[in-house]
Amino acid sequence: MLTLGLESSCDETSCALVENGKILANRIASQDIHAAYGGVIPELASRAHLQIFPKLLAAVAQDAEVSLEDVELISVANTPGLIGALSVGVNFAKGLASGLKKTLIGVNHVEAHLYAACLEEPSIRFPALGLAISGAHTSLFLMPNATTFLLIGKTRDDAIGETFDKVARFLGLPYPGGQKLEELAQDGDEEAYPFSRAKVSGNDFSFSGLKTAVLYALKGNNSSAKAPFPEVSETQKRNIAASFQKAAFMTIAQKLPDIVKAFSCESLIVGGGVANNRYFRRLLNQTCSLPTYFPSSQLCSDNAAMIAGLGERLFCNQTYVSKEVIPCARYQWESACLSH
């Protein structure tokens, strides 16, 4: 089955073609315009998606050397995300589906991030623990199989990617700051600042306290939002970045062993933009006793290959109930319960 995937949940526009689980073409266009504002401006993101989609669609068809007439299924990210951005993608997909007379399926963007690893490693054993880490999400899922996602835990405040961006801004790094903070931390002393990690009950996470601790480390007792940041040496910046990065990722890693045991998981799957962090990859490979799967770098970012792949799998497994595809900014997952 040849499947066209479309992704526009935030500030990346992407089109991809996947055939029977194999990626034929995958194009991603990032929107640099938001850097000047220090964050994503939803209206600008929507306009950019409108302009970019037609060009990307033509490009992936050329890359894969196929005609759009050959597409059998169109899969589009319709939740969760920025409502305007999602609407652009869904409406573009509906127009294509109507014009080409093809079947249309809506796919959950976060679930697709976890399915990305399955595209590259089809032999993952289930049940698996799925960890989605991005700018908007820090969530744990029980995955009885590759297409079922039951919520186990989530952040109670900031997502880890959002926290990275905020701390990067404290350190004077340009937006988006997550990768730049990782690079800064490489030459820092991760033991220089003993940032405490939030002890949240159950399987949830919290990062707001860690963010505040970094603010105090930089500003001292005068940590009000209006107070200017004092001059900090490059060595201090590197040490703060390294110490913060360790504390943030240990907040997650320290919880995983008990959760894995409680739900009898046989694998760990990690997805989302933050999954591309090399420090975190090494940390989990050192601390997790299970086979751990990360997508390749391109499939960590928002991309349409994961949307096409999950849509194709759902359709072929006949686990997708046909319904109108509607964009939705938020999504409420079913929770997993422990059986006693």
Swiss-Prot record:
Belongs to the KAE1 / TsaD family. SUPFAM superfamilies: Actin-like ATPase domain. InterPro entries: ATPase_NBD, Gcp-like_dom, KAE1/TsaD, TsaD. Its main location: cytoplasm. One of its GO terms (biological process) is tRNA threonylcarbamoyladenosine modification. GO terms for molecular function: iron ion binding; N(6)-L-threonylcarbamoyladenine synthase activity. It catalyses: L-threonylcarbamoyladenylate + adenosine(37) in tRNA = N(6)-L-threonylcarbamoyladenosine(37) in tRNA + AMP + H(+). PANTHER family: TRNA N6-ADENOSINE THREONYLCARBAMOYLTRANSFERASE (PTHR11735), TRNA N6-ADENOSINE THREONYLCARBAMOYLTRANSFERASE, MITOCHONDRIAL (PTHR11735:SF6). Its cofactor is Fe(2+). It is an enzyme of class 2 (transferase). NCBIfam families: gcp_kae1, T6A_TsaD_YgjD. Required for the formation of a threonylcarbamoyl group on adenosine at position 37 (t(6)A37) in tRNAs that read codons beginning with adenine. Is involved in the transfer of the threonylcarbamoyl moiety of threonylcarbamoyl-AMP (TC-AMP) to the N6 group of A37, together with TsaE and TsaB. TsaD likely plays a direct catalytic role in this reaction. Substrate binds at A132, I133, S134, G135, A136, D165, G178, N277. It is found in: Cytoplasm. Its EC number is 2.3.1.234. Binds 1 Fe(2+) ion per subunit. This is tRNA N6-adenosine threonylcarbamoyltransferase. Keywords: Acyltransferase, Cytoplasm, Iron, Metal-binding, Transferase, tRNA processing. Fe cation binds at H109, H113, D302. One of its GO terms (cellular component) is cytoplasm.
